[in-house]
């Protein structure tokens, strides 16, 4: 089972940014990893285990904002299609030694 957390939290005030950062930190501490901005996923051994994590994270949702949790099977997760628009250009590699002229 996979739990996917999708959230939209305000960041317009310092207090809201702090709440956003705290929620994101709680997600990471609970074993979630970032799939893309504001979308995090976590693998769970069973539906019961997934429900425990959803309840735990649901209890720390900031007062302002919205969070949705989606529970899907391993098979469904494996069928996720990812499309990437413009690929990032690789950074030029720095020389391993300084060259003096």
Curated annotation (Swiss-Prot):
Cofactors required: Mg(2+)
Single GO molecular function: metal ion binding
Broad class of enzyme this protein falls into: hydrolase
Disulfide bonds: none
Residues given in the record as Mg(2+) binding sites: 8
Keywords (A to Z) from UniProt: Antiviral defense, Endonuclease, Hydrolase, Magnesium, Metal-binding, Nuclease
Enzyme Commission (EC) number: 3.1.-.-
Gene Ontology biological process terms from the UniProt entry: defense response to virus; maintenance of CRISPR repeat elements
InterPro entries: CRISPR_associated_Cas2 (IPR021127), Virulence_VapD/CRISPR_Cas2 (IPR019199)
Domain of life: Bacteria
Classification via SUPFAM superfamilies: TTP0101/SSO1404-like (SSF143430)
Pfam families: CRISPR_Cas2 (PF09827)
Family statement drawn from the similarity comment of this UniProt entry: Belongs to the CRISPR-associated endoribonuclease Cas2 protein family.
Function field: CRISPR (clustered regularly interspaced short palindromic repeat), is an adaptive immune system that provides protection against mobile genetic elements (viruses, transposable elements and conjugative plasmids). CRISPR clusters contain sequences complementary to antecedent mobile elements and target invading nucleic acids. CRISPR clusters are transcribed and processed into CRISPR RNA (crRNA). Functions as a ssRNA-specific endoribonuclease. Involved in the integration of spacer DNA into the CRISPR cassette.
Subunit structure: Homodimer, forms a heterotetramer with a Cas1 homodimer.
Classification via HAMAP family: Cas2
Name of the molecule in the record: CRISPR-associated endoribonuclease Cas2
Organism in which the protein naturally occurs: Parvibaculum lavamentivorans (strain DS-1 / DSM 13023 / NCIMB 13966)
Gene name as annotated: cas2
């Amino acid at each position: 089972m996979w739990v996917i957390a999708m959230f939209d939290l305000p960041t317009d005030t310092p207090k809201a940014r702090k709440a956003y950062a705290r929620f994101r930190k709680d997600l990471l501490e609970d074993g979630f990893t970032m799939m893309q901005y504001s979308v995090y996923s976590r693998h769970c051994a069973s539906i019961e285990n997934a429900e425990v994590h959803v309840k735990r994270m649901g209890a720390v949702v900031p007062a302002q904002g919205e969070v949705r949790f989606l529970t899907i099977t391993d098979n469904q997760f494996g069928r996720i299609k990812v499309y990437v628009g413009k690929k990032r250009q690789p950074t030029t590699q720095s020389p391993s030694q300084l060259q003096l002229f």
